[in-house]
Amino acid sequence: MTFKATVLTLYPEMFPGHLQYSLAGKALERGQWSLDPIQIREFATDRHRSVDDTPAGGGAGMVLKPDVLAAAIDHVSKGDTRPRLLMSPRGKPLSQNRVRELAAGDGAIIVCGRFEGVDQRVIEARGLEEVSIGDYILSGGEPAALTLLDAVVRILPGVMGNDLSGVHESFEGGLLEHPHYTRPQLWEGRDIPAILTSGNHAAIDKWRHEQALALTKERRPDLLEKTQAETK
């Protein structure tokens, strides 16, 4: 099964973007996943190919029209059961758990918002799952979509050279990742922790877990609270 990503956007030239220089780009070349950016404007029906209009009730900015976006969604999703994601700052925060769920599926249809937002009716009528990559505003959904794809594709089977690479990363097991060290042994008066060169793998694993736990307590206590709540 090949992971298939279909991206609805007003800027298809932004894809694959920086992904072509990463593991995701190499995997794309090898056919381990596919990417199909679709121009939303192609589904506009007026002579100006309009995709947006002023917000009902007044206000700043423009809103992506429901008829145009719905036509684009319908075109790419006939008989398609892939999740439909809308990159949106008001969406549910993207988590590593959701990334794993997406990677286990056969792909996703990703809608990149623009302007002030997307007409709420098309969100409801087409069952769009709003997804956020953080509590900040971007100029459009394209950078967010690329971030999501990077997170998903890198954990697809066979993409990382060592399938264990993803096991010890941040958010796996509900913890931030432990610190890393490499040669030289001594650098600017700072030594690699002796435990890491001891050859005692059980002790190394214990040290790494303790470090990950301490970092998580210091920087992201909310992750620990979430993990504790899920295990109750």
Swiss-Prot record:
CDD domains: TrmD-like. Its EC number is 2.1.1.228. It catalyses: guanosine(37) in tRNA + S-adenosyl-L-methionine = N(1)-methylguanosine(37) in tRNA + S-adenosyl-L-homocysteine + H(+). S-adenosyl-L-methionine binds at G113, I133, G134, D135, Y136, I137, L138. Homodimer. Specifically methylates guanosine-37 in various tRNAs. This is tRNA (guanine-N(1)-)-methyltransferase. It comes from Agrobacterium fabrum (strain C58 / ATCC 33970). The gene is trmD.
